């Protein structure tokens, strides 16, 4: 699966806007992931004790993690699909250390699209959303391939 130059333009144009508030957007995505898919919370040792949205919103550690997630994702997206070297350490840690199933990457991908659409409705129309979904699918597929290389079936 490849994205066209125009699709990458859509992805990177909106990502430029997202980067202006990376910690906030990343934090919101992590909160929504844990709320909409509570089963994912067990994979986060430092967050599994949090039960309320208020606890999550006030967590500096969760905000930092959201920033880490979005920083890594931005680095991957900017590679325009040529992300094998950037992806390898991420896939290794997610497969062997954190044991994050690919299904959870699907969950967070959809939440990322929703949050960006809510924050930037005028700049993230149907074509941009479709391009982002495609870029995130490429990321997930490549993560799944790397998982298999590391012997994790996730």
Curated annotation (Swiss-Prot):
Keywords associated with the record: Cytoplasm, Heme, Iron, Metal-binding, Muscle protein, Oxidoreductase, Oxygen transport, Transport
The positions annotated for binding nitrite are 65
Globin domain ranges (all copies): 2-148
Q: What class of enzyme is it?
A: oxidoreductase
Q: Where is the signal peptide?
A: none
Family classification: Belongs to the globin family.
The molecular function GO annotations come to: heme binding; metal ion binding; nitrite reductase activity; oxygen binding; oxygen carrier activity; peroxidase activity
Localization in the cell: Cytoplasm, Sarcoplasm
Q: Name one Pfam family in it.
A: Globin
> Subunit info?
Monomeric.
Provide the organism lineage as a comma list. Answer: Eukaryota, Metazoa, Chordata, Craniata, Vertebrata
Q: Name one GO biological process term.
A: removal of superoxide radicals
**The protein's name:** Myoglobin
- Purpose: Monomeric heme protein which primary function is to store oxygen and facilitate its diffusion within muscle tissues. Reversibly binds oxygen through a pentacoordinated heme iron and enables its timely and efficient release as needed during periods of heightened demand. Depending on the oxidative conditions of tissues and cells, and in addition to its ability to bind oxygen, it also has a nitrite reductase activity whereby it regulates the production of bioactive nitric oxide.
Q: Which InterPro entries match?
A: Globin, Globin-like_sf, Myoglobin
Enzyme Commission (EC) number: 1.7.-.-, 1.11.1.-
Please provide, in alphabetical order, the Gene Ontology terms of the cellular component aspect for this entry: extracellular exosome; sarcoplasm
Q: Which reaction does it catalyse?
A: Fe(III)-heme b-[protein] + nitric oxide + H2O = Fe(II)-heme b-[protein] + nitrite + 2 H(+); H2O2 + AH2 = A + 2 H2O
Transmembrane intervals: none
Binding-site residues for O2, renumbered to this chain: 65
Q: What is its main location?
A: cytoplasm
Naturally occurring in which organism (per UniProt): Alligator mississippiensis
């Amino acid at each position: 699966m490849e994205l066209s130059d125009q699709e990458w333009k859509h992805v990177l144009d909106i990502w430029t806007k997202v980067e202006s508030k990376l910690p906030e957007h990343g934090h919101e995505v992590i909160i929504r992931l844990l709320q909409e898919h509570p089963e994912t919370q067990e994979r986060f040792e430092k967050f599994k004790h949090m039960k309320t949205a208020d606890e999550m919103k006030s967590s500096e550690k969760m905000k930092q993690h959201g920033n880490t997630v979005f920083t890594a994702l931005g680095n991957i997206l900017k590679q325009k699909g040529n992300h094998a070297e950037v992806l390898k350490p991420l896939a290794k840690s997610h497969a062997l250390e954190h044991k994050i199933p690919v299904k959870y990457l699907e969950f967070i991908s959809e939440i990322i699209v929703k949050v960006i659409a809510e924050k930037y409705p005028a700049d993230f129309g149907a074509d941009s959303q479709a391009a982002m979904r495609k870029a995130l699918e490429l990321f997930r597929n490549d993560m799944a391939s790397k998982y298999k290389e590391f012997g994790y079936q996730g």
